Amino acid sequence: MSTFSAKPAEVVHEWFVIDATDKVLGRVASEVALRLRGKHKAIYTPHVDTGDYIVIINASKLKVTGTKSLDKVYYRHSGYPGGITATNFRDLQAKHPGRALEKAVKGMLPKGPLGYAMIKKLKVYGGAEHPHTAQQPKALEI
């Protein structure tokens, strides 16, 4: 008996929708990263994209525990000397709902061409509406 290896043409990518209202950021991000990679499937193969599409709604209502809303800091750099900018979780959520979730999930995925393909299957929306009703996503409870 030989080891099974999934072929890219044989993989079926399903669509799921997650309501992030009052969910904890890290717990949602780890479950989403697992499903984007396809590790929840029996046909998981490390070098093939076996994951599903994930649509996250109400990302603006995500929460973090403790005082992390003020203490958790996201950094970015412009490339110029002294060009570092720091933003805390609360301000980032107010300006760009869902950006913190995208950054958390991206950090949990592999770095490289396969990881970049996986992150493209994540769709995050701050409100309750999303344009993916034609794909008939199934509700996923976390």
Swiss-Prot record:
Whether Cytoplasm counts among this entry's keywords is: no
Write out the function statement from the record.
Answer: This protein is one of the early assembly proteins of the 50S ribosomal subunit, although it is not seen to bind rRNA by itself. It is important during the early stages of 50S assembly.
Q: Which family does it belong to?
A: Belongs to the universal ribosomal protein uL13 family.
Please give an example of a GO cellular component term from this record. cytosolic large ribosomal subunit
Keyword RNA-binding listed? The answer is no
Q: What Gene Ontology molecular function terms does this protein carry?
A: mRNA binding; structural constituent of ribosome
The identity of this protein, by name, is Large ribosomal subunit protein uL13
Source species of the chain? Acidovorax ebreus (strain TPSY)
Keyword set for this entry?
Answer: Ribonucleoprotein, Ribosomal protein
